[in-house]
A protein has these predicted regions:
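N-terminal accessory targeting/assembly segments
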Residues: 1-100
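Charged, amphipathic alpha-helical linker segments immediately N-terminal to NTP-binding catalytic cores
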Residues: 90-147
Length: 149
């Protein structure tokens, strides 16, 4: 077990800002405006979901499994931050990752089905809002992981 290999954990706002900034760079070069809007919306939804889910997944995987670590290390972790609190925070991060991916899976077909660019952008905006709300729900858990690191 090497606790020094745990990556720097981003705050909720950093995570959201990074995901939205990277998604804003996604563009499609298709002549038909409505078709371009659909393709761009689909790629942007995937981009936001991936840029939120991947860091959350890396945070969960970076922490050691408490079932297989040495009892001494486990007791030190329990005394300093609390194993149960740490498990709860990691579980919340994993839940948020799954929820964000599920939202993307739900909204991509909706974005593809829209015919007009305006409706497609509304669907994309709705997906963004739901994904960012999920991340904001685990803000306390991410802050706990930052302090536990």
């Amino acid at each position: 077990m090497n606790l020094q290999e745990i990556p720097t954990i981003a705050t909720t706002e950093e995570l959201i800002d990074r995901a939205l900034r990277r998604a804003s760079k996604v563009e499609e070069s298709v002549r038909n405006a409505d078709y371009r809007a659909r393709l761009t919306a689909v790629r942007k939804i995937h981009s936001v979901a991936d840029n939120i889910a991947n860091p959350l997944h890396s945070y969960v995987k970076a922490f050691p499994s408490f079932d297989i670590i040495h009892a001494f290390d486990r007791s030190i972790i329990d005394l300093t931050v609390g194993v149960d609190k740490l498990r709860k925070a990691l579980g919340a991060s994993d839940w948020a990752r799954k929820e964000v991916l599920m939202i993307a899976t739900k909204y991509v077909p909706k974005a593809r089905a829209r015919k007009s660019a305006e409706n497609t952008m509304k669907i994309m905006s709705e997906a963004y809002t739901k994904m960012t709300n999920v991340v904001r729900q685990i803000e306390k858990n991410l802050n706990f992981l930052i302090s536990a690191r």
